[in-house]
C-alpha cells in the first residue's frame, strides 16, 4: 500500500462509492449534487418537479464522469505510466480511457436529448405526461405537484436517495435517477414485505421497515415499491384516500414498544437456557394467564457489582409479558437506552438487565 497508485485507487473507490450512495457524513459535508449546485437546481420547495429534472440530469453526468475522473487522477498518481499521453500508455489503459470517454460522451448526449423541447424528453416529464388531460401537457401536472408539495400537511419519509412523498393528490417516490408518480384515485397500495432490524442505522433503537407496492389502474403507469418505518404507517394511512391492503399478512408494529418487544424476544432467545428442577411445574403467567411462565431471571451478566441483583422468584412470567414490563419501565423519550437499561423484577424488585432473562427449557 506504499505505492501511490494503489493508495489513490483505494481512496478513489471509497470516494466514488460514497459519492454515489451518499452516506450521512458525505451529505453533512455537502458532497452532494444538490448541495454543490443548489443555485442552478433551484428551490425544491418552490419548483419541485423542475428541481428534480435538473438534479437527475446532473447526477447522471457526474456519476458517468467517475471512470474518467479515475484516469485523470492516475495521470498524477502514477506518472511512470505515461497516462498523460494516451498513445504512450499501455493497451489496457488505452481501452479504459476510450471506454470512460464513451460513457461520458453518451451521458452528455443523453442530457442534451433530455433538455430538448423544454425538457419534454426527460423521463420525469414523460411520466407526468401520462397523467395529463387530453388538452393539457406535463407542465400542468408539474404545476399541480409543485403547488401541493409546498403545503405543510404532506407526508414525507425516507432518505434523499429513496424518499416517499404523499400529497393530497399524488403518491411519489424520489430516487437517485428518477421520480415515480401515481395518482391517488388510480393507485392501490399493498403491503408485500417487512424487515425487522434490532438497531436502526441512525439511532440505537429497533426499527421495522415495511415495503409497500404502489400499483395503478392506468396501464401506462409502472408500479413501484416504497419503504418506510412501521411507526410512520398510520400517518401514511391518514394521508391516503384508499385503504392499504396487506396481502402478505405482515404484522406491522405501529409503536416503539411493539418494535422493542420483538427485539427483546430475539435477544432473550440467545441467552442461557434455564432448566427447571425435576418435579417443578410451571404455572400460568400471572401477567396474561394465557400461557405458562417460560422465563426465569438469573443474574448472569458481567455488570459491575451492585448493578444487577439476583432474583429468587420462581418462574411466574411469560416472555411477552416480561418484555412488556421491561418496555413500560423505560424512559419513553430515550428509546436508544432501552436495550442497555436495568429494571426491577415485577415481583421482588431485584434489578435485572436483558442478559439476565433466561428462557425455560
From Swiss-Prot:
Residues in compartment: Cytoplasmic: 28-56, 116-361
Which InterPro entries does the record associate with it?
TM129
What EC numbers are recorded for this enzyme? Answer: 2.3.2.27
Which reaction is recorded as catalysed by this protein? Answer: S-ubiquitinyl-[E2 ubiquitin-conjugating enzyme]-L-cysteine + [acceptor protein]-L-lysine = [E2 ubiquitin-conjugating enzyme]-L-cysteine + N(6)-ubiquitinyl-[acceptor protein]-L-lysine
Q: Which GO terms describe its cellular component?
A: endoplasmic reticulum; endoplasmic reticulum membrane
The answer on whether this UniProt entry bears the keyword Coiled coil reads no
Q: Lumenal side of the membrane: what ranges? A: 1-6, 78-94
Membrane topology type, per the record? Multi-pass membrane protein
MF annotations from Gene Ontology: ubiquitin protein ligase activity; zinc ion binding
The UniProt entry's sequence similarity note says: Belongs to the TMEM129 family.
Reported function: E3 ubiquitin-protein ligase involved in ER-associated protein degradation, preferentially associates with the E2 enzyme UBE2J2.
| Entry remark concerning the domains of this protein | The RING-type zinc finger domain is responsible for E3 ubiquitin ligase activity.
Official protein name in the record: E3 ubiquitin-protein ligase TM129
Ranked from the top, the taxonomy reads: Eukaryota, Metazoa, Chordata, Craniata, Vertebrata
Gene that encodes the chain: tmem129
Amino acid at each position: 500500500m506504499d505505492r501511490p497508485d494503489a493508495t489513490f485507487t483505494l481512496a478513489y473507490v471509497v470516494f466514488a462509492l460514497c459519492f454515489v450512495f451518499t452516506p450521512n457524513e458525505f451529505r453533512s459535508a455537502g458532497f452532494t449534487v444538490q448541495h454543490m449546485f443548489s443555485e442552478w437546481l433551484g428551490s425544491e420547495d418552490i419548483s419541485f418537479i423542475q428541481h428534480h429534472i435538473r438534479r437527475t440530469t446532473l447526477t447522471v453526468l457526474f456519476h458517468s464522469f467517475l471512470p474518467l475522473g479515475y484516469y485523470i487522477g492516475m495521470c498524477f498518481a502514477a506518472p511512470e505510466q505515461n497516462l498523460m499521453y494516451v498513445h504512450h500508455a499501455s493497451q489496457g489503459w488505452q481501452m479504459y480511457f476510450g471506454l470512460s470517454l464513451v460513457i461520458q460522451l453518451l451521458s452528455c448526449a443523453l442530457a442534451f436529448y433530455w433538455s430538448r423541447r423544454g425538457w419534454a424528453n426527460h423521463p420525469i416529464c414523460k411520466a407526468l405526461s401520462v397523467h395529463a388531460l387530453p388538452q393539457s401537457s406535463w407542465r400542468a401536472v408539474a404545476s399541480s405537484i409543485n403547488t401541493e408539495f409546498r403545503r405543510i400537511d404532506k407526508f414525507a419519509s425516507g432518505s434523499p436517495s429513496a424518499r416517499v412523498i404523499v400529497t393530497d393528490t399524488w403518491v411519489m417516490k424520489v430516487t437517485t435517477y428518477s421520480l415515480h408518480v401515481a395518482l391517488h384515485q388510480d393507485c392501490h397500495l399493498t403491503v408485500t414485505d417487512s424487515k425487522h432490524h434490532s438497531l436502526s442505522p441512525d439511532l440505537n433503537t429497533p426499527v421495522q421497515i415495511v415495503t409497500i407496492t404502489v400499483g395503478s389502474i392506468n396501464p401506462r403507469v409502472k408500479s413501484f415499491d416504497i419503504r418506510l418505518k412501521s411507526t410512520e404507517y398510520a400517518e401514511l394511512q391518514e394521508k391516503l384516500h384508499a385503504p392499504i391492503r396487506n396481502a402478505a399478512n405482515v404484522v406491522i408494529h405501529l409503536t416503539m414498544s411493539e418494535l422493542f418487544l420483538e427485539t427483546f424476544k430475539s435477544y432473550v432467545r440467545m441467552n442461557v437456557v434455564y432448566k427447571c428442577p425435576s418435579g417443578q411445574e410451571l404455572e400460568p403467567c400471572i401477567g396474561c394467564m394465557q400461557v405458562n411462565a417460560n422465563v426465569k431471571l438469573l443474574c448472569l451478566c458481567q455488570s459491575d457489582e451492585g448493578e444487577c441483583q439476583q432474583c429468587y422468584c420462581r418462574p411466574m412470567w411469560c416472555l411477552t409479558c416480561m418484555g412488556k414490563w421491561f418496555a413500560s419501565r423505560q424512559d419513553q423519550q430515550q428509546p436508544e437506552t432501552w436495550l442497555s437499561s436495568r429494571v426491577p423484577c415485577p415481583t421482588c424488585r431485584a434489578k435485572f438487565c436483558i442478559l439476565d432473562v433466561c428462557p425455560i427449557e
